A protein has these predicted regions:
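Conserved switch/coupling elements of ABC/ABC-like ATPase nucleotide-binding domains
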Residues: 220-225
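ABC family nucleotide-binding domain
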Residues: 2-219
Length: 225
């Protein structure tokens, strides 16, 4: 099966004054196309750092990243990295990161504005993905008028509007109660199965991780399973 993310010998060291902290140590990982992968481990073990490196939001201190068959040159400009992210990756975060002054429709459109998509096409595509996440009746609402689960649905709609091949989710149910968390997991599974979309999810929830295709565990920056 095709590999869409390949990490080879990834190390990440944070330096503050004279103190060095190794967040990741010699990580070697392949993610297959269409896979739903969970990354688990205690707080501070490097899970989110790993996801940020996969998502080209952070650079490793050493090691190689390959994304959809393309080796990522560490000398790539910020603009080129942003272009790759916008084309290939969708991001879902624990804290939603919605713009509070914009309604649902406008929040979901944002990635297409950065791509230069025309207004009419943006609105059409935004309405399609909003309907898909079950929020057509909330299109004109702002985030403060929505529940936590609804805000996360908006964030997922925004993440998939550009039809990215890979969805990276950092604790997507972490701020939700168990019922809303289960609904978000059901939505993610639907996106995985119906679209063949690759999903990499960081989670503390063992029950939710057990529903995915594969679990990778980290401890102190090292992959242990």
């Amino acid at each position: 099966m095709e590999t869409v993310i390949k990490l080879t010998g990834i190390n990440k060291i944070y330096r503050t004054d004279e103190v060095e902290t190794q967040a990741l140590e010699n990580v070697n990982l392949e993610v297959r196309k269409g896979e739903f992968l969970s990354i688990m481990g205690p707080s501070g073990c490097g899970k989110s750092t790993l996801l940020n490196i996969m998502g080209l939001l952070d650079e490793p201190t050493s090691g190689e990243i390959e994304l959809c068959g393309m080796k990522i040159d560490p000398k790539l400009s910020d603009n080129r990295l942003a272009e790759l992210r916008n084309k290939t990756l969708g991001f879902v975060f624990q804290s939603f990161h919605l713009i509070p002054t914009l309604n649902v429709l406008d929040n979901v459109q944002l990635p297409l504005i950065y791509r230069g998509v025309r207004s009419g096409e943006r609105i059409r595509l935004a309405k399609e993905v909003i309907e898909r996440v079950g929020l057509s009746h909330r299109m004109k609402h702002r985030p403060t008028q929505l529940s936590g689960g609804q805000c996360q649905r908006v964030a997922i709609a925004r993440a998939i509007i550009g039809n990215p091949e890979i969805l990276l989710a950092d604790e997507p149910t972490g701020n939700l109660d168990s019922k809303m968390g289960a609904e978000i997991m059901e939505l993610l599974h639907r996106l995985n199965k119906e679209d063949g979309r690759t999903i990499v999810m960081v989670t503390h929830n063992e029950q939710q991780a057990a529903q995915t295709d594969r679990i990778i565990k980290f401890l102190d920056g090292r992959q242990i399973m």
